[in-house]
Amino acid sequence: MNSIDLLKKKILYRSEYRGIKEMELLLNSFVKKHINNFSILELKQLDDLLNFDDDNLFKWYLDKKVKIKIPNNKVSKLLKNFKI
């Protein structure tokens, strides 16, 4: 298994087991839809995005005020506009 496959496997796991069911549903659906179309850079951006805690990430997704800075990149824009 190469490093890209390992990163994809890690991302899939981290998107499915979050702690907040709503985030598990949102992130896992998003990842399953996009993961095979992402470049290595986008996969790394997604991996970085998954490092944020669910509470802040969910508030950001719902356009509520958060105390952290979520990166503004292609992956975060796709997630922000993603609907289940």
Functional labels for PLM-detected ranges:
Residues N2-L43, D47-I84:
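Positively charged, polar, low-complexity stretches
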